[in-house]
Each structure stands twice: as C-alpha cells, then as structure tokens.
UniProtKB/Swiss-Prot annotation:
It comes from Emiliania huxleyi. This is Photosystem II protein D1. The chain crosses the membrane at residues 29-46, 118-133, 142-156, 197-218, 274-288. Chlorophyll a PD1 binds at residue 198. GO terms for molecular function: chlorophyll binding; electron transporter, transferring electrons within the cyclic electron transport pathway of photosynthesis activity; iron ion binding; oxidoreductase activity, acting on diphenols and related substances as donors, oxygen as acceptor. It comes from the Eukaryota. The D1/D2 heterodimer binds P680, chlorophylls that are the primary electron donor of PSII, and subsequent electron acceptors. It shares a non-heme iron and each subunit binds pheophytin, quinone, additional chlorophylls, carotenoids and lipids. D1 provides most of the ligands for the Mn4-Ca-O5 cluster of the oxygen-evolving complex (OEC). There is also a Cl(-1) ion associated with D1 and D2, which is required for oxygen evolution. The PSII complex binds additional chlorophylls, carotenoids and specific lipids.
Length: 360
C-alpha cells in the first residue's frame, strides 16, 4: 500500500491576521472598523478619566479667568467636567505639538479636543463595525442605521455646533452639570424649545419610551406557556427556537380592546419597524435642529405677538420664555461681556437728561 503525504501550505502571518480580525467566532468581534474604533475610543476614555480626576483649570472664555473642572481641584461627580477648549483657540486644531508646553496645552483646554475628536472618530467606526458584523453574519444592515441617531446627536453638540459658533469653547462640557449648563445657555441663545425639530425629538424620545414600555409589558403578559404550573415558565424557551415565544394575536386583541382596534399592530415586522423608527427619526430631527441653530437659524420668536385694540401687549408664554432666556443669558459668561447679545445690540437710549432734584 502506498501512502501519499501532501505538503500543507501554511498561511502567511498577514492571512492569519486577516482571518482573526474578520472572524465571527471571536468572543468580541474586532473587524476592520474595530482596528480604528478600539484605539480611538481607548484614547478618548483614558484621557477623559485622567482629565476628570486631575486636569488643571482651563481658560474657557479666553479672558485669563480659568475654570476648574477636575476632582482634585475641588469638584465632585456632579460638578466635575472636562472643560471645553479656550475661546482664544477658537476652532483651530490644537494637538499637543501645537502648544509651547504641556502646561500651556492644558491651560487652553487641549484635553477637550483630544477627547471629543477621538470619541467622534471612535463612534463613527463603531457604526461601521456594526454594519461589518451584520454583513459577516448575513443580517440586514438596520442596526447601524439606528445607531446613527445618537452619533448624529453627538456630532451636532461636539463638532458641528462649535464650528458654527466659531469656537470649541461653545461645545458641550463633558460632565453632568456642564451638560445642564450647555442646555440652559443653548436655550438662552437659540430658543431651542420653540424649534419644531426639537419638538419632534422630544416626541421621539418620550414616545419611544412609552412604546417600548407598552411593547415589553404586552409581550411579557402574553407568553406562551410551555411548562407546567410547578416549573418556571423560563424553562420552556431556548435561544433561537423556531416556535413563537409570545402570542401576538392575544396581545393585539388585548390592546385593540383597551384603546381601539387600529391602535395595535397585528404584523410583527411592522410593529418592530415602528418601535425602531420612531425614536431614531426623532433624534435625527433633534440633531438637524442643533446643526441648524449652530449657524444661528434659531427657534421661532413669537414675542409680543398678541396685542389688544389699543396696541398694548398681552403677554403669552412666548414672552415669559423670552424673559427667562434674557435672564439666563445675563448670567452666562458674566465676566466676558456686560450684557447679553440681545440687549447689547440695540440702540442705546438715554434714561435721564438731568439729575433729579433732591428735596431739602
């Protein structure tokens, strides 16, 4: 008997590397987009943690009045933040090598640009990695489309808005109270509450929460029991089973009687498309709204729109909102300018021509 031994060709190191990168058998899928995502996100996270703990104060307004944001400089978890880059830098690209020293780079808030730009590249690569894994597994590509909504929102507040306003100092601070400060100042300067795209975003977020709660409770309440009363219902199901887990007809009938017939879905694909599309489209609109307001195309102004027959103004909620906007703008950057832009831009009027007479 003759035995023939065929020499086995060994794959090159590059081929082995490619197979490992694109393998769906790995516990954590890497992918070619992951080669960009992992280093950028790790850089952003590392810089953020270090800056949140120990970064020195940043001259955010460019007027030599630094603002402290780190824990070691007196902040706590609520008040702490990575403070945005200085207004003196504007929208210039400000890597470490552009500064004369590390101290100057930290004083001008270079850490903020480092974190934000690496984070933005990382989450964009995460979208690509979602598409790549879906492609490898033969799935449809809608997961990455859904994730594009929060990425669009992040791009709007961290990249597009600072560019539109002319300075990264107008970007959203990376902290809890800094986020709230950004929201208040945004309302004061752009009247975002009166912008229709923001209204659609609110409907998307709150509506999505409502629909998610309704769907989850209906599914949990209409599970098809596969076990006896003496066993847990969870033992009757296994991951990837072909049989239905819950009775959509029963859920449809319940909800149709609870509200009205056409308020419920009897098609699972249409139902889940709606659950995915509603919040995603809403957040897309919010991101577009912030992007347009970045270039000062602001919310509607209905101030002093209602007057009586004598021409006297009848205040509406729009006027109340306008007064609160002016108040917030007065408090914002109080040392950088004396008046809000809305007040400082008007023609000055004399308030007194002569000194009042004082009775003896």
């Amino acid at each position: 008997m003759t035995t023939t031994l065929e020499r086995r060709e060994s794959a090159s190191f590059w081929e082995q590397f490619c197979a490992w990168i694109t393998s769906t058998e790995n516990r954590l899928y890497i992918g070619w987009f992951g080669c960009l995502m992992f280093p950028t996100l790790l850089s952003a996270i590392s810089a953020y943690i270090i800056a949140f703990i120990a970064a020195p104060p940043v001259d955010i307004d460019g007027i030599r009045e630094p603002v402290a944001g780190s824990l070691l400089y007196g902040n706590n978890i609520i008040s702490g933040a990575v403070v945005p880059s200085s207004n003196a830098i504007g929208v210039h690209f400000y890597p470490i090598w552009e500064a004369a020293s590390i101290d100057e780079w930290l004083y001008n808030g270079g850490t903020y640009q480092l974190v934000v730009l690496h984070f933005f590249i990382g989450v964009c690569a995460y979208i690509g990695r979602e598409w790549e894994l879906s492609y490898r597994l033969g799935m449809r590509p809608w997961i990455c489309v859904a994730f594009s909504a929060p990425v669009a929102a992040a791009a709007a507040v961290f990249v597009i808005y600072p560019i539109g306003q002319g300075s990264f100092s107008d970007g959203m601070p990376l902290g809890i109270s800094g986020t709230f400060n950004f929201m208040l100042v945004f309302q004061a300067e752009h009247n975002i509450l009166m912008h229709p795209f923001h209204m659609l975003g609110v409907a998307g977020v709150f509506g999505g929460s409502l629909f998610s709660a309704m769907h989850g409770s209906l599914v949990t309440s209409s599970l098809i029991r596969e076990t006896t009363e003496n066993e847990s219902a969870n033992y009757g199901y296994k991951f990837g089973q072909e049989e239905e887990t819950y009775n959509i007809v029963a859920a449809h009938g319940y909800f149709g009687r609870l509200i009205f017939q056409y308020a419920s879905f009897n098609n699972s694909r249409a139902l889940h498309f709606f659950l995915g599309a509603w919040p995603v489209v809403g957040i897309w609109f919010t991101a577009m709204g912030v992007a347009t307001m970045a270039f000062n195309l602001n919310g509607f102004n209905f101030n002093q729109s209602v007057v009586d027959s004598q021409g006297r103004v009848i205040n509406t909620w729009a006027d109340i909102l306008n007064r609160s906007n002016l108040g917030m703008e007065v408090m914002h950057e109080r040392n950088a300018h004396n008046f809000p832009l809305d007040l400082a831009a008007g023609e000055s009027l004399p308030v007194a021509l002569v000194a009042p007479a004082v009775a003896a």
